[in-house]
Amino acid sequence: MGTTTNLRSWLYLILLFIVVVGVNAQNRRPKNVQVAVKAKWQGTPLLLEAGELISKESKQLFWEFTDAWLGSDGDDSDCKSARDCLLKISKQASTLLAQPVASLFHFSLTLRSASPRLVLYRQLADESLSSFPHGDDPSATGCCWVDTGSSLFYDVADLQSWLASAPAVGDAVQGPELFDFDHVHFDSRAGSPVAVLYGAVGTDCFRKFHLSLAKAAKEGKVTYVVRPVLPLGCEGKTRPCGAIGARDNVSLAGYGVELALKNMEYKAMDDSAIKKGITLEDPRTEDLSQDVRGFIFSKILDRKPELRSEVMAFRDYLLSSTVSDTLDVWELKDLGHQTAQRIVHASDPLQSMQEINQNFPSVVSSLSRMKLNESIKDEILSNQRMVPPGKALLALNGALLNIEDIDLYMLMDLAHQELSLANHFSKLKIPDGAIRKLLLTTPLPEPDSYRVDFRSVHVTYLNNLEEDDMYKRWRSNINEILMPAFPGQLRYIRKNLFHAVYVIDPATACGLESIETLRSLYENQLPVRFGVILYSTQLIKTIENNGGQIPSSDAVTNAQVKEDLSTMVIRLFLYIKEHHGIQTAFQFLGNLNTLRTESADSSEADIEQEHVDGAFVETILPKVKTLPQDILLKLRQEHTLKEASEASSMFVFKLGLAKLKCSFLMNGLVFDSVEEETLLNAMNEELPKIQEQVYYGQIESHTKVLDKLLSESGLSRYNPQIISGGKNKPRFVSLASSTRKGESMLNDVNYLHSPETSEDVKYVTHLLAADVATKKGMKLLHEGVRYLIGGSKSARLGVLFSSSQNADPHSLLFIKFFEKTASSFSHKEKVLYFLDKLCLFYEREYLLKTSVESASSQMFIDKVLELADEYGLSSKAYRSCLVESVDEELLKRLTKVAQFLSWELGLESDANAIISNGRVIFPVDERTFLGQDLHLLESMEFNQRVKPVQEIIEGIEWQDVDPDLLTSKYFSDVFMFVSSAMATRDRSSESARFEVLNSEYSAVLLGNENATIHIDAVIDPLSPTGQKLASLLQVLQKHVQTSMRIVLNPMSSLVDIPLKNYYRYVLPNTDDYSSTGFDVDGPKAFFANMPLSKTLTMNLDVPEPWLVEPVIAIHDLDNILLENLGDTTTLQAVFEVESLVLTGHCAEKDHEAPRGLQLILGTKNRPHLVDTLVMANLGYWQMKVSPGVWYLQLAPGRSSELYALKGGNDGSQDQSSLKRITIDDLRGKVVHLEVVKRKGKEHEKLLVPSDGDDAVQQNKEGSWNSNFLKWASGFVGGRQQSMKGGPDKEHEKGGRQGKTINIFSIASGHLYERFLKIMILSVLKNTNRPVKFWFIKNYLSPQFKDVIPHMAQEYNFEYELITYKWPSWLHKQKEKQRIIWAYKILFLDVIFPLSLEKVIFVDADQIIRTDMGELYDMDIKGRPLAYTPFCDNNREMDGYKFWKQGFWKEHLRGRPYHISALYVVDLVKFRETAAGDNLRVFYETLSKDPNSLSNLDQDLPNYAQHTVPIFSLPQEWLWCESWCGNATKAKARTIDLCNNPMTKEPKLQGARRIVTEWPDLDLEARKFTAKILGEDVELNEPVAAPATDKPNPLPSNDISEDTEQDLESKAEL
């Protein structure tokens, strides 16, 4: 009784307190904010998403899941709600998965991360249907169909008929194109006709088609593929759970939302009344269990529910008074340390961190009053001696992650990758402890380049810096290389530091031009030792065709065969070198080139015999007494030095350099361009490497630099497929995952070993896929055998015969004999020599002859038996190969191999390829591939991928394995499986030593003995990064078995509040799925009880590839004042992922990025949907895409005339016109392109600067690009966002005629959108020419985007909404307003269509009083930009003219400082002169200094005008009262409402006072807007104040609703 009385008495005190402070419960009712982000595409079924997710674990599991769901296990008739279905689907999948993968699966399912893959299938389904028109009735297609490439079947009976007469395996049939992501039924036989089923599990038609096709696949009739699609309108034809998630657009998670407390020194709030908007989904209820100033209100209400209104009123008051964004300096000092203390001591540290940093303004006061434990502070300060204060680091299993790019989808992919690896290793019986060690292993970085050891007698050096007289005056102190020098400045040291050796055919134009370059650089005393290795292209082709050997010859043959010119030149060169010295020998080559160029029509022409004779005679004539012609004749007849010249070509062949045609080696580094620029770049790249070794004493004055470099890291052979380096990453497949029902096809492989090593553990396994019915396959197999004969202690070789079952009988016989040898005699000493002879015999007698010429099978058998006896093998064993049952087993094995190659490795079933510990080399160039390449591959794979795990595997104590099974083969298999699986990890090779940081007092340690994943983190909890990481780490802790060590690293001695925002990171939840119906509500960001009287601005923190825009937002999201919401309790906004961003980098080897290169992207049917150009900055480019299969190519015109795309990622030189790009997730894609100049175009430039109108006109007429960054129909479900029309065409429309005026502007917030409409009207009312407006769409409100199409139609103008995603490499701005400013200047060259030639930027708050056509047509004298200088008339403002003093006065040196409210961009000149690239370089340098670029969009072009010249417009083109004064107002062509820093007059007030026509334009715009939106227009707007010479003074403290000011005007000062 006493307790109740006490409770009631203090509640009465609470009520009394409320009355005293004057709190009105109704008015102070707390307000909330709710935000959702949806995908642009129509929803996708959750059941189909589950299939895609489970297939990531194993391709086979997709089929098991599908069969289980179609069976009784998938009966969902008892599911009464979306949540029931979610749990049913998750439970079904969990039966096929182990923990914690099953938990991660459930989370990924609620995350909807597989939805984009289904959108991709939808695109392919549309293309399938469009290939076979089905009339006007779309319903005729049904909900399922089968595509065979030649027909579509909507009925199972029709399919059965086709299956009965389907083409046989191996018959040439053009079926649908298959992709890596396709679900191919595991019983499908490679090479059989393809049948693709489009349909959805859960529909009756899918069941029927599936059963029929699965049966046919098992019978070997068809390759059965499923592409899961639920066509529109079929949702009602599926079982209860089959359509969950498909009805509405997908609601996404994995992003952050911030509500920042806005600095209201300048206000940008519209004074129009707030309109009542549509009601969205019911917002969440308030969480009363949260602590508010020590009270838990849920407990109070449980005890006294009848006092609910009084209790809630008190709670509301407490909430409204908790917000603080200011503290005294002394309270701030230890705030970071106090926060760390609160987190570390919490029962749930991660939850505590999230509650603090995501609600910081509400908790900062209580944090600042906490008593600090000095031990925490001391440890933090101690750690900060090793890591900078505030620095954030995150590592997953030892691999550092990029904090800037990290998002939930990336984190889930990385976690899944680690858990899958652990699962595969567990199946190999590897103990848990060893698995954790393996996963913590950091991969070695792939070297960017490799050195080839070319030291040989075949190198002829022209000079020697250490010995030649011409260098004697140079200094010999090697330490001078460490002296500072200007970029590009050479060091002249008498030491052979740089060795440039050209590998050339001296009879080719390229080879002889290289000699000219070499001699020129030598004569100019470049500090390089020059040399050559000469070879004959023709002889190397002969060597390739002769199995890698020089054909044996005799005198008779020599007399009959005409010697090729290259070999002749090499012999003459060697002769002259031997008799007349090196200088004369090089002079001979120079004379040869002179004669070639003088007599040839083209500089590309090769030499003729007369050139050789003439050059020889001319060279030695002054040096000999005998007639040079006689010497030449004698040399020809006697073939003097022939062996030496042939040996030189053989050396080049063995090095593998002949395929490069013309190349040079810089200290062993290979460059396939011989231009002078390439050589100088190579020197600059090599210099820091040499400097480092000199600095550390590894290179001294007596060191032979070349010997040292090549002895340490020189490879014996160059093969670009193996040592591609750079951006072409090797391709890996996990052999550990290539199992079906626990069995791997690789278990049946019998391996061959080098002599006397069959019992040794082999760290590297080469699997040769060889079709021995082809010369390529046989050559590869034979080289493999020779490789083992040559000796390898660390590798074994297995053969996967990829020959077709329909191969000729001799091939099948050869396979049987080879397999028998490998299975029964691999341990025999002479087995390899037997196989060598077997290969030779088979090649000679059967492979190289026609079936008519080849010997009989019996002869083959006899020969094999004879060889077996000769090499000590049992001929009886070979006779057993000939029984019929063996033939059947062989055919089964060939089928298994074909399935393995096709479905597991993604290769053609008859491919000739090499798989070395999972690394795939394909295609293999059999002409140049030697056994030495397998040695090279062995060395590379051992050093890069086996060494890091060798010690761990060798240290394992195998407890769950039968000791009898622990053979060398078992361990070799483990190395093969583990290293191949580890190689497929997508992870950084960077790591950090977290263990050096102390963690006793200031770290959060979350242990888990069974953890597969360990997280190391260094976090500043009071930072934007900390806000996001707090949520991400909680996800890992909840859904993945992780251990964590989180070291807190707050800033010390703060002087300002570190976080002035509220933040929510949106995560999915089971509660998003209805428990009463089949609706999926989707995750949302929910901010409860936000401050009422603070102005907030909303920003989204989305993954890097997302482009988002608001689609539902009644209120001004830039200026949220919740006390103005009235009866509405929750402000709601919905954003949409408008598109994903495809980004990339384009490079030309050994050259700068090909800036200006034009790229186009589209589908197979519509190849040009999007286009862009390549920046000079990192060769960067970007395009907007949706999920789907896209094809990238060079644009028609100069780009494709000069360049070609370089072929795949295996280092091959093939040039392809198309690059296929798959977008099937929400992470976008980064694509690395390499282009090569086309033959004959090597010296042409892509951009040819043009002056004058002719070039512009030509550009216009030949323009191929008229739809830059537009969506075609269906492209991301795109709405029409452009009033169509060519940007620069002359046309007549609705009374407007002439050339179109293009005007560009940007606005954010309702006030500036209001200004923007007025600016549009003022432009249109002053010109009769067509006008097209370009608006940056990122920040436009949904209302504006709804109104502008109607406005365009009413007022007869065109418009287009454009956007560009801020590149990840460019220094980011944090303030929204500064980002907006940056968009005005940083991306002008890439944000517009390439066909747009000129555009005028006009500030949204500007009023136009003239025909803008005059400005558009103005000659700006070839400058890329034209701005108006700041006025100088108003003397009252002299004290504010910053450009006339200090830094700006010194920097400008008499040039004017221009205002950025109006400017013209000549886009043709802007792109030609790389103005955009230059501006971005200046920006990147300056923006990192917080004191630079205070007015970003204005300061940047003014600062850069020495490099990016500006044409100064006449003053009349831009007038603003602050700087110009009223004397010149009458002549003003445009009026800008720029700020007055002296009076700070509100902008709306100034507009009404200064511009007479402004109120009428404003009223007209508001009336039109109200009409379109169906609202009442407010007519009680203040009328224009009388025009005065002085602005009205600022009100004192009482700011009226007209007192509006803007942030943007800071840029205009």
From Swiss-Prot:
Glycosylation sites: N249, N373, N1010, N1526
Observed effect of gene inactivation: No visible phenotype, but activation of the unfolded protein response. Loss of seedling growth inhibition in response to the pathogen-associated molecular pattern (PAMP) elf18.
EC number: 2.4.1.-
Keywords: Endoplasmic reticulum, Glycoprotein, Signal, Transferase
GO molecular function, one term: UDP-glucose:glycoprotein glucosyltransferase activity
Gene Ontology CC entries for this record: endoplasmic reticulum; endoplasmic reticulum lumen; mitochondrion
Listed pathway(s): Protein modification; protein glycosylation
GO biological process, one term: anthocyanin-containing compound metabolic process
UniProt cofactor(s): Ca(2+); Mn(2+)
Function: Recognizes glycoproteins with minor folding defects. Reglucosylates single N-glycans near the misfolded part of the protein, thus providing quality control for protein folding in the endoplasmic reticulum. Reglucosylated proteins are recognized by calreticulin for recycling to the endoplasmic reticulum and refolding or degradation. Required for elongation factor Tu receptor (EFR), but not flagellin-sensing 2 (FLS2) signaling.
Entry domain remark: The N-terminal non-catalytic domain is assumed to mediate recognition of proteins with partial folding defects.
Listed name of the protein: UDP-glucose:glycoprotein glucosyltransferase
Species the sequence originates in: Arabidopsis thaliana
Gene name linked to the record: UGGT
